[in-house]
Structure formats: C-alpha cells, structure tokens
Amino acid sequence: MRTTPLAKSSEIERKWYIIDATDVSLGRLSAAVATILRGKNKPQYTPNVDCGDNVIVVNASKIKLTGKKASDKFYYHHSSWRGGLKAVSYGELLANNPVKMVEISVKGMLPKNTLGHQEFLKMHVYAGEDHKHEAQKPEKLDINKLI
C-alpha cells in the first residue's frame, strides 16, 4: 500500500519571488502573498511543515484601497492602560507606514502559531521600488495571474 508522500523541511527548495503592489487591491495582494508564504501553490504542500517561498513586495505605498476603506476602516491597538485604545484610519496608515499595513493584512491570513511566525518572517515589504535582495535573484511574479 502506498502512502501519501509528505514534505520534509530539509528537502524543500525555496525560491524568491518579487511582487509589484502598484494598483493592486490590499486584500487580493495579501491573499496571494499568504498562499505563497504557506507553500499552498506547491504540489508537495504539507500543513505541518514550512514549505513556502520567500516573497518581496515592492511599491507598498502605491497599493489600492477600494471603496471608502481609506476613511472608514480603522486599525485598532491598545496600550493596556485605561483609555489607551488607539485608532488609525487605513488612509493615514497608507500615507505614514504602508509597510505596516501590508504586514498586518498578511499576518492576519497566516496561522496563529509558531509555524505561522516562521512563514511571516519570509516576507519582505518595501514602500518604494528599491530592495536589498538582488543577490537572491528573485523571480518576478505577476499578481494578476495568481488571483
């Protein structure tokens, strides 16, 4: 009887992909990046093994927010002090720190455990077009083909 072949972390070949976020919706970009980080686009995907690839996201400042999300949707965090609830609109977050906005969105789509944290560390987001990963020879990935 044949058993299903399971991936081992030592046998996995990791690629580097670069994704241009210009005029791409935040949710669609995050879903595609999370899929690649988890390794769900590979035939040897195993849920308990980190078999995903490295992803570089450039031009995060040119991401598109649809509808009225820029003014009506908020990112909340609390300082654990009374009255310490902070709210920042997505429009402000896009203007001040677009890298954090993409990271928050992708992190919410990954598992909330140690494996999810390992997968999250393989994502590199840059607000502009310049990045420091030219030595890895990243393969350009068209986001519209993934969606």
Swiss-Prot record:
The keyword ATP-binding does not apply. The keyword Ribonucleoprotein applies. It holds the Pfam family Ribosomal_L13. GO terms for biological process: negative regulation of translation; translation. Keywords: Ribonucleoprotein, Ribosomal protein. InterPro entries: Ribosomal_uL13, Ribosomal_uL13_bac-type, Ribosomal_uL13_CS, Ribosomal_uL13_sf. It comes from the Bacteria. This is Large ribosomal subunit protein uL13. It comes from Lactobacillus acidophilus (strain ATCC 700396 / NCK56 / N2 / NCFM). Part of the 50S ribosomal subunit. Gene3D superfamilies: Ribosomal protein L13. This protein is one of the early assembly proteins of the 50S ribosomal subunit, although it is not seen to bind rRNA by itself. It is important during the early stages of 50S assembly. GO terms for molecular function: mRNA binding; structural constituent of ribosome. GO terms for cellular component: cytosolic large ribosomal subunit. Belongs to the universal ribosomal protein uL13 family.
